[in-house]
UniProtKB/Swiss-Prot annotation:
GO terms for biological process: L-threonine catabolic process to glycine. Zn(2+) 1 binds at C38, H63, E64. NAD(+) binds at I176, D196, R201, L261, G262, I263, I286, A287, G288. This is L-threonine 3-dehydrogenase. It is found in: Cytoplasm. The record marks E148 as: Important for catalytic activity for the proton relay mechanism but does not participate directly in the coordination of zinc atom. Binds 2 Zn(2+) ions per subunit. Its cofactor is Zn(2+). Catalyzes the NAD(+)-dependent oxidation of L-threonine to 2-amino-3-ketobutyrate. CDD domains: TDH (cd05281). It comes from the Bacteria. It catalyses: L-threonine + NAD(+) = (2S)-2-amino-3-oxobutanoate + NADH + H(+). It comes from Thermus thermophilus (strain ATCC BAA-163 / DSM 7039 / HB27). Its main location: cytoplasm.
Amino acid sequence: MRALAKLAPEEGLTLVDRPVPEPGPGEILVRVEAASICGTDLHIWKWDAWARGRIRPPLVTGHEFSGVVEAVGPGVKRPQVGDHVSLESHVVCHACPACRTGNYHVCLNTKILGVDRDGGFAEYVVVPAENAWVNPKDLPFEVAAILEPFGNAVHTVYAGSGVSGKSVLITGAGPIGLMAAMVARASGAGPILVSDPNPYRLAFARPYADRLVNPLEEDLLEVVRRVTGSGVEVLLEFSGNEAAIHQGLMALIPGGEARILGIPSDPIRFDLAGELVMRGITAFGIAGRRLWQTWMQGTALVYSGRVDLSPLITHRLPLSRYREAFGLLASGQAVKVILDPKA
């Protein structure tokens, strides 16, 4: 089979030929039909400081994908051969204090597909059976491939007291920020403001936002106060940008909620008393997806048609054109890029 792998501690990935793996006890073999490139995959491609500290080549990359169950290992009762599945990328231990208290999304021993073990940029991949989410067979594979990152957006929007009837600021209009705008709109939030300095991506938020803000052209805090009269009740932070985090926190009304998924590339400084404590701000750190609550919430939105993820899929390319695909995403002129492992 063909697979896209990190073979050496250096920039880039390589298209390789490997034997089709066999599922062991509790595992399934998935025939991958669609895979999506994530920002994490770009870090692995670039071989930046994070990748150098985490990735151990050789490794087949990719953690956003969908496919069909081709075979099952001993002891597997579900899913069954022929099922259409999306994959939860976090493989958890079930034994640590986080898992034993139901917080599987912050398992202390998490292994991530395409990061810590072989992932889905391949024609076939073996995964734990418990990591498969079975979809209706009429759900397009390319949409099924991005249910995993969609779960990050759902987790962020529904954390804390939710967003229904509340004013919301979304900082960062990357794929997950755009997905969050969709979820917030479908969940009764309003007004919704979306801020991002990339005009291409910001435009994708137009159907779901009451106000778009390019912080390079407008004063974000001034716009927030003009639209809301005082500030927003909820901040959904996806950028990881230090300035955006500071502005987002100060855009909150006293007593507001900050839900932060974006990860800064370096440690940041902020005024704990002035930005958080004395204003009574409740902050939530968002990691992954709650298993399996987030999947149930997210698929309910997608299966019912309340959220349509397909407009975010801007490019579809064969796996053989992976260099072009990664270049598109790195350019900022794409949202979700889908790879077809069979082509």
